């Protein structure tokens, strides 16, 4: 079953809150992981692994570098769950 982008955003916000301590209300699609949310590369790996488990998708390492904003990650996960 495909998740809505809203559901994916909520799930990602919970993951980012757990990994980086960022309030879920601050996790918005336009926010940059590094610039706005202060998620470093190590934390990003944790976010990706948790997202893969939560959403049942695979995010290859070479794709992770393209996920600059929360919205990029939401779109990637939405597309990956549709094609899975």
UniProtKB/Swiss-Prot annotation:
User: Which PROSITE patterns does the protein's record reference?
Assistant: CARRIER (PS50075)
**Which pathway does this polypeptide act in?**
Lipid metabolism; fatty acid biosynthesis
O-(pantetheine 4'-phosphoryl)serine occurs at which residues?
41
InterPro entries noted in UniProt = ACP, ACP-like_sf, PP-bd_ACP
Q: Name one GO biological process term.
A: lipid A biosynthetic process
Its keywords, alphabetically, are:
Cytoplasm, Fatty acid biosynthesis, Fatty acid metabolism, Lipid biosynthesis, Lipid metabolism, Phosphopantetheine, Phosphoprotein
The answer to keyword Methyltransferase applying to this record is no
What happens to this protein after translation, modification-wise?
4'-phosphopantetheine is transferred from CoA to a specific serine of apo-ACP by AcpS. This modification is essential for activity because fatty acids are bound in thioester linkage to the sulfhydryl of the prosthetic group.
Gene Ontology molecular functions: acyl binding; acyl carrier activity
What superkingdom does the record give? Bacteria
**GO cellular component, as recorded:** cytosol; membrane
Location(s) in or outside the cell:
Cytoplasm
Give yes or no: UniProt keyword Cytoplasm: yes
Q: What is its main location?
A: cytoplasm
Locate the Carrier domain: which residues?
A: 6-81
Q: Could you say which protein family the record assigns here? A: Belongs to the acyl carrier protein (ACP) family.
Functional note:
Carrier of the growing fatty acid chain in fatty acid biosynthesis.
Q: What is this protein called?
A: Acyl carrier protein
* Species: Acidothermus cellulolyticus (strain ATCC 43068 / DSM 8971 / 11B)
Gene behind this protein: acpP
């Amino acid at each position: 079953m495909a998740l809505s982008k809203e559901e994916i955003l909520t799930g990602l916000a919970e993951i980012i809150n757990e990994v980086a301590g960022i309030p879920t209300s601050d996790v918005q699609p336009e926010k940059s992981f590094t610039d706005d949310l202060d998620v470093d590369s190590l934390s990003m790996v944790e976010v990706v692994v948790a997202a893969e488990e939560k959403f049942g998708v695979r995010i290859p390492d070479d794709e992770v570098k393209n996920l600059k904003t929360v919205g990029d990650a939401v779109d990637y996960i939405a597309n990956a769950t549709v094609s899975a």
